[in-house]
Design a protein with these regions (language model features):
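C-type cytochrome heme c attachment motif
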Residues: 38-50, 74-75, 90-98, 109-112, ...
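Post-cleavage N-terminal segment of exported redox proteins
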Residues: 2-32, 71-74, 95, 100-103, ...
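Short, low-complexity patches enriched in S/T/P/G
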Residues: 437-447
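Axial heme c-ligation environment in periplasmic c-type cytochrome domains
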Residues: 58, 72-86, 97-122, 143-147, ...
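Active-site substrate-binding loop specific to GH73 endo-beta-N-acetylglucosaminidase modules
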Residues: 58-65, 69, 199-248
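Short, solvent-exposed loop/turn and secondary-structure capping segments
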Residues: 50-51, 56-62, 104-107, 138-145, ...
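Sec/Tat-exported extracytoplasmic proteins
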Residues: 43-44, 49-52, 80, 96-104, ...
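Sequence/structural segment immediately N-terminal to covalent heme-attachment motifs in c-type
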Residues: 30-51, 55, 59-65, 157-161, ...
Length: 477
């Protein structure tokens, strides 16, 4: 028994020392580094850890709006001073899969370690090799995240992790095909689809019972991508979903914008056809938990060509007003030159039709508002798709106010999409500020206040009880 233990230790010790050794002491093969590069691409690391305004790859500095405040992405280059260059492989694995930094501090789940927790040891090893020896070190400090109290106390994430962080590495389902299993591994892990497409609970945790049924992600809404034929993408073919992942567009159906445009630009278009097909196979098998009616027109079939120009041609322009035709006038002045006077788009699909379009016919108006305010910027191998923003940005062609955006949104919805929706200027302001805010900060403050009050009352009770015992008269015989 003792000899078996000694032999086991002798075999395991070298691996343990390799895991704990700094990367500089190891030499990784080109094949392993390339595998890690591919996995990092599938994980979309560069999209979040690079400032898109001239930043260096993986050096951090990207500002990301979240329901609890602005989060800054970190430097994950192998810089020993400002990045992760001094991380052992074990520390790297803990950061990726457990959300714990090399110094022991907790990461915020804006880093999708909840999804990455399913990644295998072999893939973590490949990622480590790539980040240590395949990424150029950048010796620049990224701006720090400064969330409001008490979210700025990173130790608070320990309790969140105990409740909501999975601890199981992916295991293949023997009842499913190899392609399905590969697709699930990528979709639920590296590609972290549920991070955006699954709604969040009170504590900002993914509601797994509503997996992939749609969720708010900053100023955008990641729609239902289950196999629901009406609310999801159950009407899409395998080839259509693969095309969308690779190009970011599907004519007369959908166009990628916001975080999805980034995912296409930096990740999906660079994956192999085999992996894209695997992801599509798995995603198209995910059942819907949406309680809404599953019959009727899909969000890809609503609306028709048309315009209201005859109603106001020759009249006074209604910019800044909320008149009956204000939305149509704003559309004619700012949108029709690209999308067409009847919103039919262009024949090559570069400028999409605004009817038979998921953005205008979705279950909510978020993406209509956000597309107007933030525009679209998507890079693929064959083209650069760009729609200028109409919000507060310096590159906005025209800066529309909330009333104007609401008027334009309502015109687009009524004329070309989901005419059951109505947008108010207040709705526009929410999206302008980066999306709905969570009451989690206030709840945490109230909870901490209640806890402190309870402790104070308990201490006061103890002191009062002890003082009574000391002052209580002693009875003598």
């Amino acid at each position: 028994m003792i000899m078996k233990t000694v032999k086991s230790f002798a075999l395991a010790a070298p691996l343990a020392f390799v895991t704990l050794a700094p990367a500089a002491a190891q030499e990784f093969s080109k094949e392993l580094i390339e595998k890690g590069r591919y996995l990092a691409t599938a994980s979309d690391c560069v999209a979040c850890h690079t400032n898109h305004d001239g930043g260096k790859p993986m050096a951090g500095g990207l500002s990301m709006a979240s329901p609890v405040g602005t989060i800054m992405s970190t430097n994950i280059t192998p810089s020993k001073q400002f990045g992760i260059g001094s991380y052992s492989e074990a520390q790297f694995a803990d950061a990726v899969r457990k959300g714990v930094r090399g110094d022991g501090a907790n990461l915020y789940p804006a880093m999708p370690y909840v999804s990455y927790s399913n990644m295998t040891d072999e893939d973590i090893h490949a990622l480590y090799a790539y980040f240590m020896q395949g990424v150029e070190p950048v010796d620049e400090k990224a701006p720090e995240t400064k969330l409001p109290f008490p979210m700025n106390i990173r130790a608070s994430m320990m309790g969140w992790n105990l409740l909501f962080r999975p601890n199981e590495v992916h295991k293949d389902d023997p009842n499913q095909s190899a392609e399905w299993n590969r697709g699930k591994y990528l979709a639920e892990g590296a590609a972290h689809c549920s991070t955006c497409h699954t709604p969040r609970g009170v504590f900002m945790q993914e509601q797994k019972s509503l997996n992939l049924t749609g969720g708010q992600i900053g100023a955008w809404y990641a729609p239902d991508i289950t196999n629901d034929p009406v609310h999801g993408i159950g009407s899409w073919t395998q080839a259509e979903l693969v095309t969308y992942l690779k190009t970011g567009k599907l004519e007369n159906k959908a166009q990628a914008a916001g975080s999805m445009a980034e995912a296409v630009s930096y990740s999906f278009q660079h994956l192999t056809d085999a992996d894209l097909n695997a992801i599509a196979t798995y995603v198209r098998s995910v059942p819907s938990a949406n309680a809404a009616e599953t019959t009727g027109a899909t969000r890809f079939d609503k609306g028709a060509a048309g315009n209201e120009m005859a109603a106001f041609r020759g009249g006074k322009y209604a910019e800044g007003m909320a008149g009956d035709h204000a939305g149509a006038q704003i559309f004619a002045a700012n949108c029709a030159s690209c999308h067409g006077t009847s919103a039919q788009g262009t024949k090559d699909g570069y400028y999409p039709s605004l009817f038979h379009n998921a953005a205008t016919a979705g279950d909510n108006s978020v993406n209509v508002i956000s597309a107007i305010l933030n525009g679209v910027d998507r890079h693929t191998e064959n083209e650069h798709v760009f729609m200028p923003p109409f919000g507060d940005q310096t590159n906005a062609v025209v800066q529309l106010n909330n009333v104007e955006v609401a008027s334009l949104s309502n015109y687009l919805l009524a004329q070309y999409g989901n005419d059951k929706l109505t947008v108010t200027p207040e709705d526009v302001q929410v999206i302008r500020e980066g999306g709905p805010k969570s009451n989690m900060v206030q709840m945490a403050r109230i909870g901490m206040g209640a806890g402190v009050t309870a402790v104070v009352l308990l201490l006061a009770s103890v002191i009062w009880y002890r003082s009574r015992r000391k002052t209580k008269p002693t009875l003598s015989a």
